[in-house]
Every structure is written in C-alpha cells, then in structure tokens.
C-alpha cells in the first residue's frame, strides 16, 4: 500500500528547474532511499514534501490525501515528519526536555490548562516525560537524559534529533543525511535505530551519500540527477545500472554489486 506518492513533481526557482516531473511511491513499512549527486534536487524534494516549498506543478499524496502546499505544521499533523542535514536541537535544554518538546502536538492542552496548571496538564506532562524517557532509551540515549544537548557527541545529537521527530508519533519520517559526519560505529548504531524504527511501524525515506549504508538498509531506491529521475529499483538493480554508475557511483563501485 502506497503511503507517500509523488506525481509529476516540478519545482522551479526562476529559470532554474531544480526538480523536473519527478514520480515516486513509498510503500507503507519500507525503508526507501533518494540518492544522487550534490545539487541533484534531493533536498528540494524533501522540502516540497514537508511543506517548506510549494511545487511549481505536480502533487504530493500522503495516505491517499493530497497534501500539496500544506504548511509544515499541518504536514506534521498528518503524521509525516523530517530531520535536516544540519543537526537541529535545542542546545541549552536537556536530552529529555528536547524530546518532550517534540511531542507538543500530542499534548492537546488548552490555554487554560497551561495557564492554570490543571490536574489534566500535570498528568499529561508526566505521561509525555515518561514517553520521552522511553524514546531516549530506544535511541541509545537512556544514560544521557539529563545532559545538555550541546554536550553530546555528533552521533548522539543526530540520535536526539531522530528522537524529537519520533516523539510526535509519526507514520513516516524523512531523514536528510542521517549518518553524515559519523564514524563507522556511529553509522552502525544509526542503521540499527532506523531498522528498529521501521519495525515499530514507521515508514522511512532517507537521503544519504554513504552508499554502503544505503545499499545495506534500503529496500527501494530512487536516483536523481540534475533534477530528473535517472533510475529506480532495489539496491542490486541500482548499483548495476550503467547510467547510475556513470553519473553518480563511479566505475569503481560496479565490482561491489
């Protein structure tokens, strides 16, 4: 069943066509990848899906509903969240406080609940902090809940950003270069987290340049080049595709297929 479907997506910036007539289908429960050279249009696709950009033409469907042009806030409310290339956490808040902020859409607190600190508000806050602690444990941050985010390693900050995204109980998460700048050990841990997230019922679409990671974790791949879809298929098909090898992977990658 298609959870996310992109139909004929085009995004132009003045005379530049960043993405041209792009189609993509992500099935519920899969880990899909969007790959290609720098400047290929991958982040533009993510920004259009998540409501940061409005497309010049085409549609974005999520759970069968047309969400084209939805605001980022409303896209999140639909159950579709994303992370960014640059780590975005609240540096001077603790790990637990950061994750709690990610669940603000679940709080359903009225103005009076917040103003008067009602019993419902206190109970809800307790529940959300307990959930934040559970997510911290799931993301390998269980022993760091009271640490300030700015004191975490790069790998742990990326895990925290992932936890913040998961705190809103999404059905799908978009990961923009989740292992960029990570060590081999940190990359393996992030792969474990992504697979475990999929196993919890969350569909994943990622952009990543670490081809070893992508080929090991993704079930289906889409390749962009100069804004155009160059290829799609499973990892074995993609790494054996001559056009993809020529435009992106390089000839030295072919023997690894």
Task: Please report, for each region that a protein language model flagged, where it lies by residue.
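Glycine-rich phosphate-binding loops of nucleotide-dependent enzymes
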Residues: 1-257
């Amino acid at each position: 069943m298609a959870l996310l479907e992109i139909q004929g997506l085009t995004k132009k910036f003045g005379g530049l066509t960043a993405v041209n007539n792009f189609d993509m289908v992500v099935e519920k429960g899969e880990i899909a990848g969007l790959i290609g050279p720098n400047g290929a249009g991958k982040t533009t696709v993510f920004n259009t899906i998540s409501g940061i950009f409005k497309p010049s033409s085409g549609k974005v469907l999520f759970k069968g509903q047309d969400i084209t042009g939805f605001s980022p806030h409303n896209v999140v409310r639909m159950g579709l969240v994303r992370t960014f290339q640059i780590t975005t956490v609240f540096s001077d808040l603790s790990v637990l406080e950061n994750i709690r902020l990610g669940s603000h859409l679940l709080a359903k607190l009225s103005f009076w609940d917040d103003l008067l600190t009602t019993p419902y508000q206190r109970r809800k806050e307790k529940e959300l902090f307990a959930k934040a602690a559970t997510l911290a444990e799931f993301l390998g941050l269980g022993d760091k809940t009271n640490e300030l985010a700015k004191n975490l390693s790069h790998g742990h900050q990326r895990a925290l950003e992932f936890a913040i995204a998961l705190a809103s109980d999404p059905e799908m998460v978009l990961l923009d270069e989740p292992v960029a700048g990570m060590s081999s050990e940190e990359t393996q841990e992030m792969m474990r987290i992504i697979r475990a997230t999929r196993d919890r019922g969350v569909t994943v679409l990622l952009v990543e340049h670490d081809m070893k990671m992508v080929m090991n974790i993704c079930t289906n791949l889409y390749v962009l080049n100069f804004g155009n879809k160059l290829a799609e298929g499973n990892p074995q098909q993609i790494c054996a595709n001559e056009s993809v090898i020529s435009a992106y992977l390089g000839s030295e990658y072919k023997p690894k297929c």
